């Protein structure tokens, strides 16, 4: 067992299954990535069940840059261009232009307004005219192959929603410490205990998908 795994509860399969159950019940989960990557933890909620109080928690306890993870198909359906033509960020984080609901919001920055924007974007019949640009919600485009293609929080979020049987749209924000520094695994685990949230890793999800997909291929 690695030092990282020793801080976590259960096996990778148990952690993923617990996270899927939590998401189905409308609860948040905490996902950390590789220590040699961003080495950060994100608080993640299903977009379709996100409440105003959960959004307020993302704003209060995290960095405040609340992101909406979407599939490539959804990004295209909403007509969202990428934030920049040539992405030179270290981990190729796929930000589109930021968005706001075209109706039902005031300044767009409150918790309720951001939830309104997210609900407008993930609606089954959502179209480009339902959103204004720019805004206070930051969509991220997930790679089609999920965490097996890119080991990022964006892909982990969409994969978790799919595995949970939810819309493949999730909301994330990086957890920060009270002093504004980024929370690392020990602080993420403490945060999870305080708020009764499952903590898992992107690597857990990679292993879980590989296990399930290998079983399906062998059947």
Swiss-Prot record:
Pathway: Cofactor biosynthesis; riboflavin biosynthesis; 2-hydroxy-3-oxobutyl phosphate from D-ribulose 5-phosphate: step 1/1
Cofactor: record remark: Binds 2 divalent metal cations per subunit. Magnesium or manganese.
Site location (Essential for catalytic activity): 136, 174
Keyword vocabulary terms for this entry: Lyase, Magnesium, Manganese, Metal-binding, Riboflavin biosynthesis
EC number(s) given by UniProt: 4.1.99.12
Known partners and oligomeric status: Homodimer.
UniProt-recorded name of the protein: 3,4-dihydroxy-2-butanone 4-phosphate synthase
Organism listed in the record: Oleidesulfovibrio alaskensis (strain ATCC BAA-1058 / DSM 17464 / G20) (Desulfovibrio alaskensis)
Name of the gene encoding the protein in the UniProt record: ribB
């Amino acid at each position: 067992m690695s030092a990282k795994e020793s801080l976590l509860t259960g096996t990778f399969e148990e952690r993923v299954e617990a996270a899927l159950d939590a998401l189905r019940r409308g609860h948040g989960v905490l996902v950390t990535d590789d220590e040699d990557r961003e080495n950060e933890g994100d608080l993640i909620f299903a977009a379709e069940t996100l409440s105003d109080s959960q959004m307020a928690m993302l704003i209060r306890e995290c960095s405040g840059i609340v992101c909406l993870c979407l599939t490539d198909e959804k990004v295209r359906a909403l007509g969202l261009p990428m934030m920049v033509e040539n992405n030179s960020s270290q981990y190729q984080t796929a930000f589109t232009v930021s968005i706001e609901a075209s109706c039902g919001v005031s300044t767009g920055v409150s918790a309720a307004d951001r939830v309104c924007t997210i609900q407008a974007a993930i609606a089954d019949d959502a179209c480009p005219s339902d959103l204004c640009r720019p805004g206070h919600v930051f969509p991220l485009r997930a790679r089609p192959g999920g965490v097996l293609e890119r080991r990022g929080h964006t892909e982990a979020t969409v994969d978790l929603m799919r595995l949970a049987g939810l819309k493949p749209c999730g909301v994330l924000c990086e957890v920060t410490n009270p002093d504004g520094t980024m929370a690392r695994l020990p602080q993420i685990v403490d945060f999870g205990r305080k708020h009764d949230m499952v903590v898992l890793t992107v690597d857990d999800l990679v292993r879980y998908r590989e296990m399930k997909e290998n079983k399906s291929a062998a059947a």
